[in-house]
């Protein structure tokens, strides 16, 4: 995909003045693991990290706001964005679609770090863009790409714990619960190919680990300037 200056979005790891662009942190997790809570905590503390707000066709949940939690759009608008190649990645999750727009991440003037809160399918597609890898079964696919996305997986402490969390969330029958648990099982198997894995058995402890990853990656990036 080309921009008005004829530069591929996929090639924009460097700003036009030659300085490294901001880092991309891609955080994913099974449903009910606390990913959104941890990401919100991070954004509250690190004001210089920009959140990439995803587009979705699902309905708003209580407390969510359009343009802040997600861009809530209908299926027709989502189809249009796919047709016009406006997404870096999009995925169908439990019958609802989620997508990350190119303009949210590959703005040529962006120097700030960006936080992507996306599912495992989304990370797979992001990896394909940056590393030409077909899927997460191909680790180290960004080995020669200094400015690749930093992938972080939030894991539940156990299968049983995740089951209890999803039951407490409510709003789903036993068939939906089993579907989410089976999906979580497959997602957790792919977590070994992420850069980092954080087990969320204690929210404050998990947040300290997430924050430490951000700080460490920023220091690593400074060495390349």
Question: Where does each model-flagged region fall?
Answer:
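NTP-dependent small-molecule kinase module
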Residues: 2-8, 12, 164-172, 179, ...
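ATP-binding Walker
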Residues: 33
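Post-Walker A helix-loop "phosphate-sensing" segment adjacent to the P-loop in P-loop NTPases
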Residues: 44-52
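Conserved phosphate-donor/acceptor-positioning beta-strand/loop module used by diverse small-molecule
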Residues: 113-120, 135-168
């Amino acid at each position: 995909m080309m921009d008005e200056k004829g530069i591929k979005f996929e090639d924009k790891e460097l700003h036009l003045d030659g300085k490294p662009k901001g880092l991309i942190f891609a955080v994913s997790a099974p449903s009910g693991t606390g990913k959104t809570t941890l990401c919100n905590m991070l954004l509250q503390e690190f004001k210089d990290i920009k959140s990439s707000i995803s587009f979705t066709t699902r309905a708003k949940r209580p407390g969510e706001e359009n343009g802040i939690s997600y861009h809530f759009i209908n299926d027709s608008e989502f189809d249009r964005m796919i047709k016009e190649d406006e997404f870096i990645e999009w995925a169908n999750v439990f019958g609802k679609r989620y997508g990350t727009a190119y303009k949210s991440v590959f703005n040529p003037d962006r120097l700030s770090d960006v936080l992507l809160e996306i599912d495992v399918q989304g990370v797979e597609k992001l990896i394909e863009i940056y590393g030409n890898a077909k899927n997460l079964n191909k680790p180290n696919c960004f080995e020669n790409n200094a400015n690749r996305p930093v992938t972080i997986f939030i894991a539940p402490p156990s299968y049983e714990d995740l089951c209890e969390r999803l039951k407490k969330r409510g709003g789903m029958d036993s068939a939906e619960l089993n579907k989410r648990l089976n999906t979580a099982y497959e997602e957790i198997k792919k977590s070994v190919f992420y850069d980092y894995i954080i087990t969320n058995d204690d929210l404050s402890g998990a947040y300290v680990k997430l924050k430490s990853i951000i700080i460490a990656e920023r220091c690593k990036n400074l060495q390349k300037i």
